A protein has these predicted regions:
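Short, conserved turn/kink motifs that form compact alpha/beta structural patches or helix kinks used as
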Residues: 22-111, 130-214
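Active-site-proximal polar cores
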Residues: 1-35, 109-132
């Protein structure tokens, strides 16, 4: 990825001038309101072979360095007024006094059109020493897409059960393990069995889950 400053490349194809954005630093409460951000034209490509279902949009944002005394870092998120989020992949300060930020917005073509809640298991003991596990909200309202992978039918002691495996795509990078589960809008819960791209800032996080059944 080239970060060389090219005024023609950076400003000849700008899509918007001096719009308000918010810069967020994931994992912290830090945020900065910036009023003079400039965005170039969005470049859309397919993130992987998916028939167009998974796309990645790349763009260059220019942030006025005079607006705050910090500096953008890879992994920071630029949020537009319409709530569209852009993850910064790389940033450099140019001779014009603006931060040139190469950003990406990974999106499912149909949209991350569901909002799921992530719950965490809390283990406690009663006065008699018996252990019990209860589930508590950990992260709510996470934009996601739930994608079925496969279903397996099993006969267990004359009882037929169906085991459903799914993938859940989220834009947020969440530190998940087996102590977490995901609750869908219809109340269905999914046990987390694995995840990918949790350490990458340039890809959607993929969560492998199994539907919980009584």
């Amino acid at each position: 990825m080239s970060l060389a400053f090219d005024p023609t490349d950076d400003f000849a194809d700008v899509a918007d001038f001096q719009q308000d954005v918010t810069l967020l630093r994931p994992g912290t409460s830090d945020s900065w309101a910036l009023a003079h951000a400039v965005r170039a034209v969005v470049r859309v490509s397919e993130a992987r072979a998916s028939g167009g279902d998974v796309t990645e949009d790349d763009v260059v944002w220019h942030l006025d360095a005079a607006e705050w005394d910090g500096s953008p870092q890879p992994g920071d998120v630029i949020v537009q007024s319409d709530a569209r989020r852009w993850t910064i992949l790389a940033a450099r300060l140019t001779a014009t006094g603006r931060w040139r930020c190469v950003c990406r917005d990974l999106a499912i073509a149909q949209g991350l059109d569901q909002y799921v809640d992530v719950e965490v298991a809390i283990s406690t003991k009663d006065p008699a020493g018996a252990e019990s596990v209860t589930w508590h909200p950990w992260r709510t309202g996470v934009p996601a897409r739930i994608q079925p992978v496969r279903s397996t039918v099993e006969d267990d002691y004359q009882r037929r059960t169906v085991s459903s495996e799914l993938k859940i795509y989220v834009a947020d990078q969440l530190p998940l393990d087996e102590t977490h589960r995901i609750r869908a809008p219809d109340g269905t819960t999914y046990r987390v069995v694995g995840c990918r791209n949790a350490e990458r800032i340039d890809a959607l996080m993929e969560i492998d889950v199994v539907e919980e059944r009584d």
